[in-house]
Amino acid sequence: SPDLMRGQKSFEWMIDWLDNQFLELSKVLPDSWSTLYGGRATKLAALALRARILLFAASPLVNGNEWYLGFKNSDGEERFSQAYDANKWKKAADACKQLIDEAEKKGKGLYIVNNKENGKVDPFMSCYGATMRTEGEGNNEIIWFRPKGNYGDWEQHGTPRGCGGNGGDRK
């Protein structure tokens, strides 16, 4: 369709477009899905992706970074702005606050395990549980997850978490 043949736009145009798309999606996606449809996008997933792209756009990697000087589209326009914009951080912070507020309304929160001996937060077990426990096991920190079948279990068991595996945890 000619409408889709827009050519290369600037990074800022793309971020604004994605921001608007995720915001609109958050208005039409459901709060949750039944277990049968687990892993599908929800309102919180859309808001989380929105916050993440806005944080990236505000970061020094692309916000005023001179590394991208000379990256131009076919019309000769700069693809990345060379000017630092502090308002990008404000917009990202507002998106993160909106996500946190919506998540708390839905009963989401940090996964915390208290030490049985002194009642204080156990940072190791809290971190372990946040990354290794499912929602069914009491982890209400999960916003969006990747469902898996029982195929390829040995490969996944031996693959580090950073590469999509479970790093030796059988759960």
Can you say where each PLM-predicted feature lies in the sequence?
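An aromatic- and glycine-enriched ligand-binding surface/loop that stacks and positions planar moieties
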Residues: 43-44, 55-171
